[in-house]
Structures are given as C-alpha cells and as structure tokens.
C-alpha cells in the first residue's frame, strides 16, 4: 500500500489516480487527520507527501513522518520542500514564480526518472524552492532546471 499524505491540495487526487493506474493500493490521509505512529502502523510500502498551499512547517505531520519513515518517500511540490526542510534545508522564494508554466529539467536517470528522457518538460506549480546551498549531505540532487541548476527539482 502507498500512503498519500494530503496537504489540502486539489492536485493530490491527480497523484492518487496516476498511482492507482499502475495497480497500486492507495490510502489517502489528511496531514492533520492522522499522527505519525498511526501512519507508520498502516505499514505503507511507500509514502507520497502531496502538494499544498502552505509551508512545510504548516503541513501537519509531513516533516515528522519524513524523518520517522523507513520506506521510500516521494515529495511533490510542498512534499518536496518538506523533505528538504525536514533534513535542515532552507525553503526560500523561487527566483521566479511558476504556476502552470512549462519548464525543462535535467535529471540523473535514476529511480523515478529511470525511463524518462533528460532533459524533459514538466509543468511547475510553485513559488518556493529548497535552497541548493542549504541542502544537507544526506540528500542528493537528482534533478534541476535545465536553465538554472541552482533550482532543485528532485
């Protein structure tokens, strides 16, 4: 089962449907509707932290669950920022705001990017990013903007 933490964003269910299309069992819980212990007691194989309209510090159990998890965690938008923040990275305003804008990213071809060409086009919906120079050693950068390698995309 894949546990999706919903940070009150309409895009959450797009993710749920995409994951479901691959045959995965998905359970969705709101970020303030479950605590970390109960989330881990569900024994998810993977966790997805969804986008949302707030900062990582305001995203319920997101950061605490990231730190407590022993299974792979995928963070999308706010979830990505929460991973960086949970490990001590700084979340800052993006160099430019991109809501519904297409950008090219380059990636290392590993894991989630394994069968995706690099560079590739993605749609961005965020105004905050994890500052590259604040990223702790525990986290590896797997994707950046093609035209600005300082903007982390994975």
Residue spans for each PLM region:
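Short loop/helix-cap segments at secondary-structure boundaries that form the rim of catalytic
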Residues: 20, 39-41, 83-85, 132-136
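Short gly/ser/thr-rich secondary-structure transition/capping motifs
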Residues: 27-33, 56, 103-106, 122-126, ...
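Cysteine-nucleophile active-site neighborhood
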Residues: 44-114, 119
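Generic structural signal for residues in well-ordered beta-strands
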Residues: 26-28, 91, 141
């Amino acid at each position: 089962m894949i546990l999706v933490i919903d940070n009150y964003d309409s895009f959450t269910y797009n993710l749920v449907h995409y994951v479901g299309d691959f045959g995965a069992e998905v359970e969705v819980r709101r970020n303030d509707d479950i605590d970390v212990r109960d989330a881990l007691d569900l024994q998810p194989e993977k966790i997805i932290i969804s986008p949302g309209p707030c900062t990582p510090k305001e995203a319920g159990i997101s950061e605490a669950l990231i730190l407590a998890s022993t299974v792979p965690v995928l963070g999308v938008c706010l979830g990505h920022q929460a991973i960086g923040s949970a490990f001590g990275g700084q979340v800052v305003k993006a160099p430019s705001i991109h809501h519904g804008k297409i950008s090219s990213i380059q990636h290392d071809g590993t894991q989630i990017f394994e069968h995706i060409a690099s560079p590739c086009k993605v749609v961005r919906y965020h105004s905050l990013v994890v500052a590259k120079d604040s990223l702790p050693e525990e986290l590896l950068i797997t994707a950046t903007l093609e035209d600005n390698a300082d903007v982390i995309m994975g």
